[in-house]
Amino acid sequence: MDNLFSRITGEQPLSENPNYNLIQLDKYNYELSVSVPGYKKEELEVSIINNRLNINSKSKKEKEKETKKINWIHQGILKNNFSISFKLEHKIKIKYANLKHGILNLSFFYDLPDQEKPKKISINEEHDHKCNI
């Protein structure tokens, strides 16, 4: 029952990872959208380490101190720290990241080396040549 109460009142998040969408735009381009309502760009960190995309919220110590001074009757909107991580192939390159209306969008593409890209081979048509001997 305590667990149910804490979920209903929002005292503990159901998940520390934010919701996200991953969309394939075409053969080589993708977009990752992460729901981060209430976060400013200064409070978010996006990095790639060892082919792992990491998205983290950064703690704000000053705001935590200010929050402690408030006498909450009910606090249903929480802004908890989170960390979400995705393993990337070495061929994935990030184009950009932007934050708009509480959604962090990352655009990335599959950078296939030229030697791995499909190549069309043209077919020549040979004409029959008759030899007159």
Curated annotation (Swiss-Prot):
InterPro entries: A-crystallin/Hsp20_dom, ACD_IbpA/B, HSP20-like_chaperone
Keyword Membrane included in the entry's annotation: no
Domain of life assignment: Bacteria
Gene3D superfamilies: 2.60.40.790
Pfam families cross-referenced by the UniProt entry: HSP20 (PF00011)
Keyword list, A-Z: Plasmid, Stress response
Domain (sHSP): residue spans on this chain: 11-126
Stated family: Belongs to the small heat shock protein (HSP20) family.
PANTHER family, sorted: PTHR47062, SMALL HEAT SHOCK PROTEIN IBPA (PTHR47062:SF1)
Name the record gives this protein: Small heat shock protein ibp
The species this protein was found in: Wigglesworthia glossinidia brevipalpis
Lineage: Bacteria, Pseudomonadati, Pseudomonadota, Gammaproteobacteria, Enterobacterales
Gene (name only): ibp
